[in-house]
Amino acid sequence: GIVIINTCGFIESAKQESIDTIIRFSEAKEEGLVDRVYVTGCLSERYKDELKDGIPEVDAWFGTRDLPRLLKTLKADYKRELVGERLLTTPAHYAYLKIAEGCDRPCAFCAIPLMRGKHVSTPMEDLVKQAKSLAANGVRELILIAQDLTYYGLDIYRERKLAELVRRLSDVDGIDWIRLHYAFPTGFPMDVLDVMAERSNVCNYLDMPLQHASDDILKSMRRGITQEKMDRLIGDIRNRVPEIALRTTLICGFPGETEAHHQDMLEWTARMRFERVGCFTYSHEENTHAFKLEDDVSEEVKRKRVEAIMEQQAGISYELNQKFVGTQQRALVDRTEDGIW
């Protein structure tokens, strides 16, 4: 048989996991357990030449936009499997719908533009068609994702079209929930909040990675925004949709981050009271703008700062969730296990 390994090359731990998987299946090929090994995805896009030399057992390497070449390489039987309906890796009732590929933002810490290229929006007609197909197969929740939802439409329609897309997807029969992930703060199209308020199947939820709160670090990260502007944006969002649940992600230990910068972020997250926060240690990635800077915060300090943010946030999330005690809420059940749903 053929093994196709879809890799990630975003941060060091993901790269190592991908390489370990490639080596494992290369050894399986040497033992006669598989016939061919193909590697695709971000790691292949970013390090193809180096990996070719280091792991010659791989039969072919494909980049992030090489699906046509991959299909051409495969025999007809395998090709039919790849171009047919989606095989969901999520529970059957929800699916991720990727509305764009690539990113035009200049964030200093991020290697995605190197691997995924410029932002390319998927035409609305194609996305509506995908949504109808997913709904026909039992999907009830669509989670819209992209490296940058905010930019959707600017490249192919010459204007931001996220609101129109969400409205059209909400018209698809059978879709009960639509959720928005990964919206960039700068230039966020506020009209999408009007759709959120109007449509009962568009969740009052927004995932907007803000990454830091200190103006010094935001500038060094090349985020194009200040703490004051983020405060104003979050206030405007909550005014438009008072019941909205906001999630953000933050990075601890970016080059030059001092204890004062960290305390600034702690105080800011306490004041913002996000419903959810994800916090990660900075990963020093080659070929990014930040790689020129000294990775001067120790791994131990990075971890402690993440723990401080997440410990504080656990208390905030708990307090915010108390308003739901004693209420009835609609839910989708992922699984049941020993009387637990």
Which ranges hold each PLM region?
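Cofactor-cradling patches in redox/metallo enzymes
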Residues: 1-72
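Canonical Radical SAM [4Fe-4S] cluster-binding loop centered on the CxxxCxxC motif
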Residues: 92-125
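Conserved alpha-helical substructure of the radical SAM core
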Residues: 116-143
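Conserved SAM/AdoMet-binding glycine-rich loop
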Residues: 35-41, 46, 51, 136-260
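N-terminal [4Fe-4S]-dependent radical SAM core
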Residues: 61, 67-96
